[in-house]
Design a protein with these regions (language model features):
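Iron-associated oxidoreductase/ferritin-like identity signal
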Residues: 1-150
Length: 150
């Protein structure tokens, strides 16, 4: 893999994280009902503290590599499964959407780790490993929510 491939994956991950912030925040305000309280809280916390921090870390790394993160007109929104449900009490569809997104993010960060290893870029590799751990923890949390809703 080349440095160009690392930069491409960093840009993709940055766009995904920004889109996730928007979708997590939106869902945290759209969901209603007592059973959704914990899900709403987790979405808000993750959007504000983790996903936005990931985007900032990715943007910083892109800058260090003399590249720039994509702006809003440069990336395509793809998180169809994270769109707010028609029924605001349908927390299960949001939970499933989060699990699906986290699995996609995990694959992106694994690809970034491989690309960084092949490009001999240990700084990007370390960053991707760190973020991968966060994404795996969040997926586990939402799988737990899923079991509670079954």
């Amino acid at each position: 893999m080349t440095n160009d491939e690392v930069i491409s994956l960093l840009r993709q991950a940055y766009g995904d994280e920004i889109e996730t912030v928007m979708n997590y925040l939106t869902n945290s305000y759209v969901l209603q009902g007592l059973r959704a309280d914990e899900v709403r809280g987790s979405l808000r916390t993750d959007a504000r503290q983790e996903e936005l921090a990931h985007a900032e870390q990715l943007a910083e790394r892109l800058s260090e590599l003399d590249a720039r993160p994509p702006a809003s007109m440069e990336f395509e929104a793809t998180q169809e499964g994270l769109q707010p449900p028609e029924d605001s009490a349908d927390a299960l569809s949001v939970i499933d959407g989060v699990i699906d997104y986290e699995e996609e993010a995990i694959e992106t960060y694994r690809a970034l780790i491989r690309a960084a290893q092949e490009a001999d870029d240990p700084v990007t590799e370390d960053l991707a490993v760190e973020i991968l751990g966060d994404e795996e923890a969040h997926r586990a949390e939402f799988k737990s929510f899923r079991r509670d809703f079954e």
